Structure formats: structure tokens, C-alpha cells
């Protein structure tokens, strides 16, 4: 199912179509200042400041991150700490988990660190949210939404800064020792995006189970 907050509903689409036939939408469009397509989340492709393929990758990452932010934008601290059952993860913990996984791939692809050679400082900061489970259930709580958004933003800013230093040859470089088999940096960072998409689905499910949650069409 398409994200309902990203794409128009059938009813809204029909309304828009009717407006177009009368020329009203054209007048509205003409009255708006022009926007650069480079800033549109719905344009996947090269972006200024990056090599062609890295820019395309960042556009996919930005679209997915926007979907996550849409999912959590109205959540209170109580919502973020909500535990569905004794083995579930909270939404707050999942948000830190996203940052932890991205930080791991920073260490791996930017600094050449494998999973068994991570610095102790990294393990202390990110080990628990990477693994989740009982330690995360006990420790990752009591924070408002801004706390989690700042963690995500700081991590993403580092990723983008490092991407700007690199080219498509780096993106295509193959790690022959990766556990999945020969894997290039492009695949690793696409996995970061895919991983975020999976957890966004989990976040939406948990939202639907919050006390007092209204039925959703997502």
C-alpha cells in the first residue's frame, strides 16, 4: 500500500483532476515561485554536491527518512515509551536503533572497521541500541521526540558529509569479506535504507496499537 501521507487518495485525486479541467490549478501553479527539482523528495536521482550515484542514493535515503518522520511526528513521550508486550521494542528504541545501524555502516564503509573490530567507544554508545532486546527496553525511555530526532539528524549529517568526500568508484568498491558474500558499498548503504523501511512498518504497527489509537488505512 502506498504511504497515505505521501500520495493522494482517490478522492483527492479526483478533486484535483476536476480543478485541472477548469484551469484553476494552472492559475495556482503559475502564481507559485519555482522550486528546484533538486530539493524534491519525490525526485530520485543525482543531487548537487555529490557524485551521480551517491546523489541518487542520498535521494532514496532522504525519501525514506521523511516517511519515518511522518510516522512519528505527533508522538508523545508516553507513545514513544509504549511497550506492546514483554518482548516488543518501543518506538523510541527503534529510532535509536536506526541511528545505531547507520553509525555501524559509517564505521565499516568510511573507516574500514569490520563488526569484530569496532572501537570500544562505539560499542559503549551504540551496542545496546544495535542489539535491542531487554537492555534497550530497560534503558531507552523517558525521552521526548526531539531527543530521538536529534540523534537521527546528527548521525545522518555525518553520513552526508562523508558522502560528499567520496565518488562513485568508492560506492562501487566491493568488500569480498562481507558476511553476505561479495558486497559493494552501494549495497551496504541501500541496506541502510531498506532496513529503515522495514522498521517504519514496525513503527506504524506499534502506532496502531497505542492506547486510544484510531483505525488507520495504512
Regions found by a protein language model. Name each.
Residues 8-9, 18, 38-47, 58-69, ...:
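Short, contiguous alpha-helical
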Residues 73-78:
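Extracellular-facing binding/remodeling surfaces
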Residues 10-29:
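N-terminal export leaders
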Residues 128-172, 188-192:
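Acidic/histidine-rich alpha-helical segments that form the ligand environment
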Residues 1-8:
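N-terminal secretory signal peptides
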Residues 51-58, 80-82, 91, 139-147:
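Second-shell loop/turn segments in exported
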Residues 43-52, 134-138:
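Acidic/histidine-rich, surface-exposed loop or edge segments in extracytoplasmic proteins
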Amino acid at each position: 500500500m502506498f504511504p497515505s501521507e505521501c500520495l493522494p487518495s482517490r478522492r483527492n485525486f479526483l478533486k484535483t483532476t476536476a480543478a485541472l479541467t477548469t484551469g484553476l490549478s494552472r492559475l495556482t501553479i503559475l502564481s507559485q515561485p519555482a522550486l528546484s527539482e533538486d530539493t524534491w523528495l519525490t525526485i530520485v536521482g543525482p543531487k548537487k554536491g555529490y557524485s551521480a550515484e551517491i546523489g541518487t542514493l542520498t535521494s532514496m535515503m532522504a525519501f525514506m527518512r521523511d516517511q519515518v518522520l511522518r510516522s512519528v511526528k505527533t508522538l508523545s513521550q508516553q507513545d514513544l515509551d509504549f511497550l506492546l508486550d514483554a518482548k516488543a521494542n518501543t518506538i523510541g528504541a527503534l529510532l535509536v536503533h536506526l541511528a545505531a545501524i547507520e553509525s555501524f555502516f559509517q564505521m565499516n564503509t568510511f573507516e574500514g572497521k569490520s563488526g569484530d573490530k569496532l572501537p570500544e567507544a562505539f560499542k559503549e554508545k551504540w551496542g545496546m541500541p544495535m542489539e535491542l532486546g531487554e537492555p534497550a527496553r530497560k534503558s531507552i525511555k523517558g525521552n521526548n521526540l526531539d531527543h530521538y530526532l536529534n540523534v537521527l539528524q546528527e548521525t545522518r549529517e555525518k553520513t552526508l558529509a562523508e558522502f560528499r568526500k567520496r565518488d562513485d568508484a568508492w560506492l562501487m568498491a566491493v568488500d569480498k569479506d562481507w558476511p553476505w558474500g561479495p558486497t559493494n558499498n552501494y549495497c551496504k548503504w541501500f541496506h541502510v535504507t531498506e532496513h529503515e523501511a522495514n522498521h517504519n512498518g514496525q513503527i506504524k504497527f506499534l502506532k496502531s496499537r497505542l492506547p486510544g489509537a484510531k483505525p488507520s488505512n495504512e
